[in-house]
A protein has these predicted regions:
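Short conserved AdoMet
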Residues: 29, 43, 91
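Alpha/beta-hydrolase-fold catalytic nucleophile elbow
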Residues: 51
């Protein structure tokens, strides 16, 4: 597992049989370059599998437009909410071999479970939040709680048919 800004990531060509991305593409804006890079990193028969959050038809940026725009400022800085069809417009280097669309209600349940788990373990988590966030630990506790609540509401909206989960399997061109 590598944790790094994907825009700065480099590997030798034809290094990987498989690349798996879970909830990373929402933090990227230059899909064309990222798909090109990944295609170089994959072996000839390599596959890319992506899991993303997406909207059923809208793509929109996460941009801080007002002082109280906390989700864009703290959780998705500089990223995009892709539409379910967004990746179909970026197939110069990789081609979508198969695509799956899942109801947002799955993530609604996940976000609610994370919130419940966080609340049940507050005493255990508080020192960790203090270590990571310092004097802002209480603020960040509330941000995370609101994040889970907001995600649960968004992804559960209209029975999970607006904000979705997209899975994609790509092959090299």
């Amino acid at each position: 597992v590598i944790t790094q800004d994907v825009n700065q990531l480099t590997f030798t060509e034809a290094t990987f049989d498989r690349v798996v991305s879970v909830e990373m593409f929402e933090h990227v804006r230059n899909y064309a370059q990222l798909f090109k890079n990944i295609s170089h990193w994959l072996k000839a028969d390599g596959l890319l599998w992506c899991h993303i959050f997406c909207h059923r038809f809208l793509q929109y940026p996460f941009e801080v437009q007002e002082e109280d725009d906390w989700m864009s400022a703290h959780f998705f800085t500089g990223g995009l909410m892709p539409a379910i069809s967004t990746f179909s417009h970026f197939q110069d280097d990789l081609k979508i071999e198969q695509q799956w669309q899942w109801s947002g209600q799955h993530y609604e349940k996940t976000a609610n479970a994370w919130l419940e788990n966080m609340d049940q373990h507050q005493k255990l988590l508080t020192p960790i939040f203090e270590q990571i966030y310092g004097k802002d630990a209480r603020i960040w506790w509330q941000r995370w709680r609101l994040f889970f609540m907001a995600c649960a509401e968004l992804f559960g909206y209209e029975q999970g048919n607006q904000w979705l989960i997209g899975h994609y399997r790509f092959v090299k061109r």
